[in-house]
């Protein structure tokens, strides 16, 4: 059986953007650092890494749309943190952010990773931003690198 997969390596020529939702920045700043670390560790050239800042997670899909429409990026890593509160706001923001990112990804056919935390409390967010449960920004970047290489291997 022939196995087709993407490797975790960059040539240094790939242009990747990180879209970061600034809301809950104490968490999202750490996700960005994790994503940047993964990019550099796997051979990325920092000159080819861009950081796009948006106010909150709800704005990520529109920034993603504009970033991919520009043709400037080979892939995009989306990070943010939506923390449940006492109102239904969490449900609306989480659902629409997820759907929006998925729709834009399918429209453009470019690798996009989903590193948006959807958690019940700040403790869970901090754990997923590098304290106990790894750094989900790092994981999101490795996922997008792997998919970028998979697309190349598939001739896409």
From Swiss-Prot:
Q: Which residues hold 5-amino-6-(D-ribitylamino)uracil? A: 23, 57-59, 81-83, 114
The enzyme's main class, written as a single word, is: transferase
Q: Which GO terms describe its molecular function?
A: 6,7-dimethyl-8-ribityllumazine synthase activity
Is Zinc-finger found in the keyword set? Answer: no
InterPro entries recorded: LS (IPR034964), LS/RS (IPR002180), LS/RS_sf (IPR036467)
* Domain of life of the native organism: Bacteria
Q: Where does it sit, as one GO cellular component term?
A: cytosol
Annotated metabolic or biological route of this protein:
Cofactor biosynthesis; riboflavin biosynthesis; riboflavin from 2-hydroxy-3-oxobutyl phosphate and 5-amino-6-(D-ribitylamino)uracil: step 1/2
UniProt record similarity statement: Belongs to the DMRL synthase family.
User: Know the name of this protein?
Assistant: 6,7-dimethyl-8-ribityllumazine synthase
Query: What's the source species for this entry?
Result: Campylobacter curvus (strain 525.92)
Q: What is the lineage of its organism?
A: Bacteria, Pseudomonadati, Campylobacterota, Epsilonproteobacteria, Campylobacterales
């Amino acid at each position: 059986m022939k196995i087709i997969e993407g490797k975790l390596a960059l040539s240094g020529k790939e242009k990747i953007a990180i879209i970061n939702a600034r809301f809950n920045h104490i968490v999202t700043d750490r996700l960005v650092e994790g994503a940047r670390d993964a990019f550099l560790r796997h051979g990325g050239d920092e000159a080819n890494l861009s950081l796009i800042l948006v106010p909150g997670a709800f704005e990520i899909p529109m920034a993603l749309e504009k970033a991919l429409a520009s043709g400037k990026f080979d892939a995009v890593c989306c990070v943010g943190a939506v923390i449940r509160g006492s109102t239904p706001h969490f449900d609306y923001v989480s659902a629409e952010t997820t759907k929006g990112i998925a729709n834009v990804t399918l429209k453009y056919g470019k690798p996009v990773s989903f590193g948006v935390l959807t958690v019940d409390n700040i403790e869970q967010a901090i754990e997923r931003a590098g304290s106990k449960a790894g750094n989900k920004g790092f994981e999101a970047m490795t996922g997008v690198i792997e998919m970028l290489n998979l697309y190349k291997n598939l001739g896409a």
